[in-house]
Amino acid sequence: LRESKESWLDIITPPLRLLCNEIIKDVVSQHQYKADYVCAIDSLTMKLEGCIREICRRRSIPTVTEDKHNEILLEKLLDKLGEECNLDGSLLLTPCTHKLLMTVLTKQGYNLRNNIAHGFTNLSDYNLQNAIMVLHSLLKISAIKV
């Protein structure tokens, strides 16, 4: 977050509450309830990327790089950031957490972040499996000490 009194928790709580409510209704109804995960998954996936970038910045891991002409600053791709998180030997991400995040967010797996950001999703992508993957990823990220 840019300088403000808000925390990530303030921003994550509303879509997290929405996601948990939908999961509970879906599971309790034994999948008879037509859960609507669209807003929660979209929002939390983008917040997940923001949290990862914030953790990197707080650990002095650069989140931007220059283009090949050294003219423009570009945000590093998440897979590149994931590689750099453990370069200093601090093991910021455990191998399990790293694998989970790369599977959920990058081309190495579901590429959920890119697909959402660029509108490449279908309604069928907003399902219980993806909801739980995003929730699990958030829980893993929240355990990182900065």
Predicted regions and their residues:
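Short acidic alpha-helical/loop segments enriched in Asp/Glu that coordinate divalent cations
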Residues: 26-44, 53-72
